[in-house]
Amino acid sequence: MITLQRTPLFDVYAKYGGKTIDFGGWELPVQFSSIKEEHEAVRTAAGLFDVSHMGEVEVKGVDSLAFLQRVVTNDVSTLKVGGAQYTAMCYENGGTVDDLLIYKRGEEDYLLVINASNIEKDYEWLASHVIGDATVVNVSSEVAQLAIQGPKAEGILQKVVSEDLKEIKFFKFKNDILVDGIPALVSRTGYTGEDGFEIYCKSEDAAKLWEKLLEVGAEEGLKACGLGARDTLRFEATLPLYGQELSKDITPIEAGIGFAVKPNKEADFFGKATLKEQKENGAPRKLVGIEVIERGIPRTHYPVFIGEEKIGEVTSGTQSPTLKKSIGLALIDVKYAAVDTEVEIEIRNKRVKAVVVPTPFYKRSK
């Protein structure tokens, strides 16, 4: 029997009603109260997520920038200390190794945050391409990560932080902030489509921090949230999930994150030729939004048709808690990607009518 990995917060899940599942080899809470309730809490108040299963890799040394420029698609040279950047790592053919965040903590000090299911693969990929005086260290087991997300997230977190959180702008961070006396890196980032913060601390401090935040946020409606709500929230905001919208067979351009690909940066990076070609002339496939007109929910890998021609497949889909509609993301032939194109999705051996719609499905009002 495979032993599932657990985060430092595993022992407190039960106290808050956590129901755990196997998620990529991790025993993680899919929900605490209900996915719908948690989803709505994040859209209207705030939610707290344990995302300690995510991986963290430190890159340091004189050649750290040159190394990162070689292995990621975005232009790391534009990143200033205290800034975060969304990017991707690609294979030479343009397929995606992973999507990730890079935090610049110092001139020769970067923290990479990678997907849980890819930790070993990513670390090996990075370590096998390291150059010059650059070091790559997997610190995933030492670091815990909590995410507090939603319109009331800032006010709740401010109760246990002395620094003015308004000074931390979107995709910026502060290192060594004390959160209820616990040293942490606090960044204004997230995976929900709402305002919020991600908090990185030592593994041994995570449970105390989790309990404290839920305590001080209770009156504002802060709820413990699981993976189910995290998925429906990111899906509505059209944020890609590796293994669904991104994979070794899907390029960042196809997945709609071309903004994180800078083919004109000086450095030669893996996948540059393919990605440059796709960015300039268009990719053969495109990730689009689809809304089901008839009954049925589109799910991952369901085929999409026009007439008898299979034009692609669904990557993610659900009954949207916010929009109250059955919607999906689908990677389809670019010829059919125009909004209002009528398509059919095969749901349980039955063709169901759907239409291509604009994305993101949800965008918060500023």
UniProtKB/Swiss-Prot annotation:
Cystine pairs: none
NCBIfam families xrefs: gcvT, PRK00389.1
GO biological process: glycine decarboxylation via glycine cleavage system
Entry-linked Pfam families: GCV_T, GCV_T_C
Annotated GO MF terms: aminomethyltransferase activity; transaminase activity
Record family assignment: Belongs to the GcvT family.
UniProt keywords, alphabetically: Aminotransferase, Transferase
One cellular component term from this protein's GO annotations in UniProt: cytosol
Physiological role: The glycine cleavage system catalyzes the degradation of glycine.
EC class name: transferase
UniProt protein name: Aminomethyltransferase
Encoding gene, per UniProt annotation: gcvT
Subunit structure: The glycine cleavage system is composed of four proteins: P, T, L and H.
Catalytic activity line of the entry: N(6)-[(R)-S(8)-aminomethyldihydrolipoyl]-L-lysyl-[protein] + (6S)-5,6,7,8-tetrahydrofolate = N(6)-[(R)-dihydrolipoyl]-L-lysyl-[protein] + (6R)-5,10-methylene-5,6,7,8-tetrahydrofolate + NH4(+)
InterPro entries, A to Z: GCS_T, GCS_T_bac, GCST_C, GCV_T_N, GcvT/YgfZ/DmdA, GcvT/YgfZ_C, TrmE/GcvT_dom1
EC number annotated for this UniProt entry: 2.1.2.10
SUPFAM superfamilies: Aminomethyltransferase beta-barrel domain, Folate-binding domain
Highest taxon of the lineage: Bacteria
